Every structure is written in C-alpha cells, then in structure tokens.
C-alpha cells in the first residue's frame, strides 16, 4: 500500500517525484509552522529542516498541532521531527533546536533548500531570513500576523507590496522597501485586529512586547494555506 496514493492521483507521478526530491526548511514551529510541517509531510515532501528553539508549553495547546499534555516540555523541533517520521518514515528530517536570527543565520546553508517558510514571530528574524533567502536565490513565503483574529477566510497570499490592514505587514512592507527587497511572497489577513478582552499574565517571549489572543482555527488555516502554496510552487 502507498501512503500517498490519493495524492498521487491528483498530482501524478511527476508531481510526487518533485515533492519527494524537494527539501523545505520551516522556521518557527508554533501555531502556523506546525500545520505547515504537517501538510508538507502528508503531501510527500521528502526532506524537511525544522527550526525552533522553543519547547512546548501548556498555553500552546489551544492552537498548536504539536502541543499536547504528553508533549509539554519537549523541544518543538524534536516533537515535529518525531511526528513527520511517523507520517513518512522515509523522510529526511533535521531538527534544529535553535533560535534563528542575524547571529545564527550563517549556520544555515540556504542554497541547499528548495523552499523556505518563515513562520517566525519577530521582525528582525524575519528580515534576516528574507535577506539570506534572497542572497541564495531560494523561494521564501513569509507568514505575517495571525494573532488577534477570528476569521480565517480573510487570509490572502500576495506580494508584500500589496498588503494592507495587518500591523506586522505595515512594518515588514516598510522594512522590505528600505532594503530594496522585491517579490517577497507573504500570507496576511485583511481582518482588523481584535483587542484583547483580558490582560495576559504570561511571561513575554524574547523580542515580544505583548501576547496576542489566538484560537485554533486561525493559525491552522494559515499554515495549511502556506503549505498548499509551497506544494503548488514545487510541482510547477
């Protein structure tokens, strides 16, 4: 039996072979990135580099695929690797348990990737990722803000220059223009951010000024849309 038989019917032998031979790096394995990895693995992508320095916490359970009571405290990169190999034992998976940013960018060979997915939260890390991807000539798709939103139908995939509404998109648009970056593909939402109804008591992660509210059905849809775009680009 072929685990990917139904996908093969849709994509054909040529498409499946392209996915099997593809190497995709996913930076950030949270609410969005976890679903990106899941869909890529189930689509038959043959090699995945999974990058995240964080561990699963109890507050991740409401929205993150990798977060279960049984995985709390486990490295997200390791949890993702185990899950991918349970889906496709033949996949080549590298778990990078480290924070990606300007200081660690040189540790990654971007010329070895066929596609890069940015599901990182911080602007400096996102810009460092775009910088290295552009230098290597490797396609990249960046996820912008998915927090403080309730309507997953408002997501769009487009060029950074065509974004609107999203506060993170505004910052990234300005920074990309300043650096002369063109043709940066992003996922963003046209939904106006929803103000939090309560003040968070969680400790702020590094580089974050506040914690957005979140629900399971928004970042998951973003991740699946991104994975779909990556697959379509890879088989073209």
For each predicted feature, which ranges?
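Hydrophobic/small residue at the entry helix of a nucleotide-binding pocket
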Residues: 32-33
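Conserved SAM/SAH-binding loop
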Residues: 97-105
């Amino acid at each position: 039996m072929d685990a990917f038989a139904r996908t093969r019917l849709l994509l054909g032998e040529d498409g499946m072979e392209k996915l099997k031979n593809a190497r995709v790096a996913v930076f950030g394995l949270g609410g969005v990135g976890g679903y990106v990895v899941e869909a890529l693995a189930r689509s038959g992508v043959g090699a995945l580099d999974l990058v995240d320095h964080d561990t699963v916490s109890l507050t991740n359970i409401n929205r993150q695929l990798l977060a279960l009571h049984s995985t709390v405290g486990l490295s997200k990169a390791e949890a993702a690797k185990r899950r991918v190999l349970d889906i496709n034992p033949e996949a080549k998976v590298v778990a990078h348990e480290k924070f990606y940013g300007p200081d660690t960018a040189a540790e990654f060979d971007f010329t070895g990737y066929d596609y890069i997915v940015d599901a990182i939260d911080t602007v400096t890390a996102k810009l460092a990722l775009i910088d290295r991807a552009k230098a290597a000539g490797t396609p990249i798709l960046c996820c912008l803000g998915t927090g403080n939103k309730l309507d997953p139908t408002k997501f769009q995939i487009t060029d950074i220059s065509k974004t609107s509404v999203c506060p993170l998109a505004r910052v990234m648009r300005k920074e990309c223009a300043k650096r002369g970056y063109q043709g940066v593909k992003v996922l963003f939402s046209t939904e106006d951010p929803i103000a939090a109804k309560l003040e968070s008591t969680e400790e702020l992660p590094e580089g974050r000024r506040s914690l957005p509210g979140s629900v399971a059905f928004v970042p998951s849809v973003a991740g699946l849309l991104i994975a779909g775009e990556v697959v379509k680009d890879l088989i073209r």
